[in-house]
Swiss-Prot record:
Residues in Death domain copies: 427-515
ANK repeat start and end residues: 67-96, 100-129, 133-162, 166-197, 201-230, 234-263, 267-296, 300-329, 333-362, 366-395
InterPro entries linked: Ankyrin-DD_containing_protein, Ankyrin_rpt, Ankyrin_rpt-contain_sf, DEATH-like_dom_sf, Death_dom
Gene label: ANKDD1B
Record protein name field: Ankyrin repeat and death domain-containing protein 1B
Positions of disulphide bridges: none
Keyword field: ANK repeat, Repeat
Biological process terms in GO annotation: signal transduction
Species whose genome carries this gene: Homo sapiens (Human)
Length: 528
């Protein structure tokens, strides 16, 4: 070739590359926009993108689409037959692939566009192309659930036994998407029972149906004798997978076939523990109604109650306690559920466990009570709640009253008090702590009120510095107020008398003028 010819050829090549690059940039934007609507987004785990070498970059460049090729794929996505016809007449390559190795047929099948699929198959579109995740059009037809498209693809010679990179066949995809007609066609018409194989996770189609909670599919696979009690590579049965996602109806159907409601997976976790860990309250209630073993011995030892406390599922906590779950059961660290809740500073869970009458004296492997754990973790609100509870239950025991059956009329709570009824007395206590009491004087008061040394230390462990005694004293006074209201006493009157008894007569006098404001409200106060 002469130099001029070579120059023209190089110019044409450069122009073509520029054209393809511009089209690729536009096409990438369109692909990203369109991906959200495509069914195959969730069909395969997307591998992590690695850096491209020179050879990879060159390959990627060849995958970029020209404008007409991009338009043709977009026409297939939107079922635009007129545009597909026009572009086909312009000799567009109908089998061209995009950067994900997908053809126009992938898009048409994925969106159930019968007309576009028919057009492509009549013009000899390839049915054997797998995208970068191994997905073929037969997989997409099974996923999208169009029996008509499936029939067309089978007639065109699509590989009925193809698997993607995750080892999933058309039967897996149809099962996962709950397309019963597709499953019936594959098994009863095409006799493809050999597709009933585990995927790369060790899951047969039956396990996928259970994981998705597809009751109709579970029943159909059972009818077709494709059910299994086998476990996947994680040691999960169909029951475990259904429980993980809270599929109560599916669990009910599965339990009708297998009676071992307490079967463990490879991690020694039962269905109840899976359901509690994930906070599936309705499923937990169903399993409890089926007499599931509440206190199954497992390693590592985390009871259902520990699991719901760890994962903050308070509704499930109430269900377990109503079913008589051992409230003081120990885990491998010899922690009760209260220890765990206190360590996390979870006020609502601590409140629930305290009101249920848990053991406040239980110690873990380090010899720490829940109070010591909360104090160490700097959860001052929980520390206050635990001290209130210790004093409350000590008072009930002294008066021989049932912990679970309070005789007094107040609403029991150990939370911080924000009620209007106690506003005046709380104002007095704040003034007393921050303006009247000197360093070390609140401890004298606390001991006169029978606070234990552990309780005083727990209060002192939060906050530090020269002025910290004011905050400590205020917290102790509020805890005392809880006990006074608990016994239906008059807070202002009792405060006056006890200040005198503790050796603070001048401070006692300063409380007198609050009495008239609190007399009418003290009997109505809610314990906090």
């Amino acid at each position: 070739m002469d130099p001029a010819g070579r120059a023209r050829g190089q110019g044409a090549t450069a122009g073509g590359l520029l054209l393809r690059a511009a089209a690729a940039a536009k096409g990438l934007r369109e692909d990203l926009w369109g991906a959200a609507a495509l069914p195959w987004r969730s069909l395969s785990r997307i591998p992590k993108r690695e850096g491209l070498g020179e050879e990879d970059t060159a390959v990627a460049g060849h995958e970029l689409l020209l404008p007409n090729e991009r338009s043709f794929q977009n026409a297939a996505k939107s079922n635009n037959l007129d545009l597909m016809e026009k572009l086909f007449e312009k000799k567009v390559n109908i089998n061209v692939v995009n950067n994900m190795n997908r053809t126009a047929l992938h898009f048409a099948v994925g969106r159930n566009h019968l007309s576009a699929v028919d057009f492509l198959l009549k013009h000899k579109a390839r049915v054997d192309v797998a995208d970068k995740h191994g997905l073929t059009v037969i997989h997409l037809a099974a996923w999208s659930g169009s029996l008509e498209v499936m029939l067309m693809l089978v007639k065109a010679g699509a590989d009925q036994r193809a698997k993607n990179q995750d080892g999933m066949s058309a039967l897996h995809f149809a099962t996962q998407s709950n397309h019963v007609r597709i499953v019936e066609y594959l098994i009863q018409d095409l006799h493809l029972k050999d597709l009933n194989q585990p995927d790369e996770k060790g899951r047969k189609p039956f396990l996928l149906a259970a994981e998705r909670g597809h009751v109709e599919m579970i029943e159909k696979l059972t009818f077709l004798n494709l059910h299994t009690s086998e476990k996947d590579k994680g040691g999960n049965t169909a029951l475990h997978l259904a429980a993980k996602h809270g599929h109560s109806p599916a669990v009910q159907v599965l339990l009708a076939q297998w009676q071992d409601i307490n079967e463990m997976n490879e991690l020694n976790i039962s269905s109840l523990q899976i359901a509690t860990r994930n906070g599936h309250a309705s499923l937990v209630n169903f399993l409890l109604s089926e007499n599931v073993d509440l206190h199954q011995k497992v390693e590592p030892k985390e009871s259902p109650l520990h699991l719901v406390v760890i994962n903050n599922h308070i509704t499930v906590v109430n269900s377990l306690l109503s079913a008589q779950h051992d409230i003081d059961i120990l885990n491998q660290k010899q922690q009760t559920p209260l220890h765990v809740a206190a360590d996390r500073g979870n006020v609502e869970l601590v409140e629930t466990l305290l009101k249920a009458g848990c053991d406040l004296k239980a110690v873990d492997k380090q010899g720490k009570t829940a109070l010591a754990v909360a104090s160490r973790s700097n959860h001052s609100l929980v520390v206050g709640m635990l001290i209130k509870a210790e004093r409350y239950y000590a008072w009930r025991e002294e008066h021989h009253e049932s912990i679970r059956d309070p005789s007094t009329g107040f609403t029991l709570t150990f939370k911080q008090d924000h009620s209007l009824e106690t506003r005046h007395i709380r104002t007095l206590l704040w003034d007393l702590a921050y303006h009247q009491l000197k360093a070390n004087e609140w401890q004298r008061l606390a001991r006169s009120w029978n606070f234990t040394d552990d309780q005083i230390r727990a209060i002192e462990e939060q906050w530090s510095g020269n002025e910290s005694f004011r905050e400590h004293g205020h917290r102790a006074l509020l805890i005392w107020l809880h006990g006074t209201l608990m016994t239906q006493g008059d807070p202002a009157k009792q405060l006056y008398e006890e200040l005198v008894h503790a050796g603070f007569p001048k401070l006692a006098e300063k409380t007198r003028h609050f009495k008239s404001k609190t007399d009418s409200n003290s009997k109505k106060c809610v314990v906090s």
